[in-house]
Each structure stands twice: as C-alpha cells, then as structure tokens.
C-alpha cells in the first residue's frame, strides 16, 4: 500500500471512530433529565427543526422529534 493511501485509510478510520462516539461524551454535555414523548404516527413530511439539542431548549424542556418536527417539549419522567 502506498504511503498516501495508508494515510487516507487511517484518516478515514479515525474520522469514523470519532463520529461513532455519543455526542454527550464528545462535547462534555449531558442531556436533560427525562424521556422524549413517543410519537407513533407516520409523517408524510418533516418540518424544519426548531431545535437541534437539549441545551437549545429553555428550562427543563428537551429537544425531541414530536409532531413531525424536532422541537422543545416537556419530557416524560418515565417510559410508558
């Protein structure tokens, strides 16, 4: 294997491994308490997101996929 090919291969593997880590571990951010509410209906389309992660939501709200959109919602305390 050529040195340039080996470098490309190694870089690709390292990039894949770093992306496979959970976000909370990578960025040192812990998710807010609670669980996202279940949304079991099929979405014919997905709306533009209002949030991308929990820290973008005020108070105790979590960023969850709900009603065909990523939005800030009150979390469930238990899974039902």
UniProtKB/Swiss-Prot annotation:
Q: Which organism is it from?
A: Mus musculus
Protein function: Antibacterial protein.
- S-S bonds: 36-64, 43-68, 51-63, 57-72
Please give the biological process terms from Gene Ontology that the record holds.
Answer: defense response to bacterium
Record-linked Gene3D superfamilies: Elafin-like
Q: Where in the cell is it found?
A: Secreted
SUPFAM superfamilies, A to Z: Elafin-like
Superkingdom is: Eukaryota
Q: Which GO terms describe its molecular function?
A: peptidase inhibitor activity
Signal peptide start-end = 1-20
Q: Which UniProt keywords apply?
A: Antibiotic, Antimicrobial, Disulfide bond, Secreted, Signal
What are the annotated GO cellular component locations?
Answer: extracellular region
Q: What is the designated name of this protein?
A: WAP four-disulfide core domain protein 15A
